C-alpha cells in the first residue's frame, strides 16, 4: 500500500529547530545545516533494519514504498558495528523541509503514529513554549580513563602518520547529571546557533 503524501508551502522563516520545538508531543527528528534541512515528528513508518551485512539492503527495500515522492525524508542512525543492535530508520508523519529559503510541510499517511497522532497541527503558527531555568550540568567522567583515551588517540594518529591506518573512528561515553531534566530542544538550538555550518541532527538510536 502506497502511503498518501501531501505537501504545502508555509510562510514562516523561523529556524527549523525552533519550529520543531513547538511541534506536538511526539518523537522528534532533525538534520539541519546552515539553517536548511529537515525536521520531523510523529512516526509514519519505522523500518526494522536489524543487524548483519544486509541491513542497508533491508533499509533500501523498506523505503521503496515512499519512492513516489521526492520530498519524503527518512531519518536514520546506523551502528558502526553491523552486529550491534540499535540502528534506526524512521519516516516521520509530519516534516518541515527548508531548501533555498522555502519551507514546505510534508505529511505522510501511516499506521504507527509513534504517539504523534496525525500531527497536522500548526507548528508554523505556535509560539515557543516557556522554558524553565536549567541547572548547570555536571561532568561525572567516563568509563574510559583520560590517560587511556589520550593514549588511544595518540596511537591512532601515529598509525595514520606511518600509513598503517587510513581512517579511524574513536568514541567514548561521557556521563552528565543535572538537577533539572535535559532539554533536548534547547540543546539543539544552542548547538545550531554556535556551530551553524555543522550538521545538527536528532535521531534516537
Regions found by a protein language model. Give the residues of each.
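Signature of the chorismate-utilizing enzyme
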Residues: 1-205
Amino acid at each position: 500500500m502506497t502511503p498518501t503524501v501531501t505537501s504545502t508551502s508555509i510562510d514562516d522563516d523561523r529556524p527549523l529547530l525552533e519550529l520543531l520545538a513547538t511541534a506536538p508531543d511526539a518523537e522528534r527528528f532533525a538534520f539541519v545545516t546552515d539553517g536548511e534541512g529537515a525536521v520531523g515528528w510523529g512516526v509514519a513508518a519505522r523500518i526494522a533494519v536489524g543487524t548483519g551485512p544486509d541491513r542497508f539492503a533491508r533499509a533500501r527495500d523498506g523505503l521503496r514504498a515512499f519512492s513516489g515522492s521526492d520530498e519524503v525524508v527518512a531519518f536514520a542512525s546506523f551502528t558502526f558495528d553491523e552486529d550491534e543492535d540499535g540502528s534506526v530508520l524512521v519516516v516521520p508523519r509530519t516534516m518541515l523541509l527548508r531548501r533555498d529559503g522555502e519551507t514546505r510541510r510534508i505529511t505522510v499517511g501511516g499506521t504507527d503514529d509513534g504517539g504523534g497522532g496525525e500531527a497536522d497541527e500548526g507548528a508554523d503558527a505556535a509560539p515557543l513554549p516557556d522554558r524553565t531555568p536549567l541547572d548547570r550540568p555536571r561532568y561525572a567522567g567516563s568509563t574510559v580513563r583520560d590517560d587511556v583515551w589520550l593514549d588511544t588517540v595518540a596511537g591512532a594518529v601515529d598509525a595514520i602518520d606511518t600509513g598503517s591506518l587510513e581512517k579511524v573512528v574513536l568514541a567514548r561515553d561521557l556521563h552528565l547529571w543535572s538537577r533539572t531534566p535535559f532539554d533536548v530542544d534547547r540543546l539543539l538550538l544552542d548547538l545550531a546557533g554556535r556551530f551553524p555550518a555543522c550538521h545538527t541532527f536528532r535521531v534516537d538510536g
